[in-house]
């Protein structure tokens, strides 16, 4: 899949029933209660579409490189759970480097998973 092949949809276009599990990725250095609030919002959205959010990976570091421990943990969790939906607080939580981000999204889309950006209300399928 090439960069231009991604479909960006608003959440109104997303199929509301899924068969499988979901995981979440949050990059934040905010207080724990704020991180828990973000996770609760993701859990609620998962339940609303009839899917169980099993794991939330939190990256509290300042590093934005794609080759960091929290991304490795995320990928291992995705493999382990076989999740079909990935919630992320902001798509740029994975990395702010455009080429790395496109490659990473491309890797996710080859699984396939539905990627949900909570901050920008976008999904990628």
Predicted segments — roles?
Residues 1-125:
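Short, structured surface patches at the beginning of a domain
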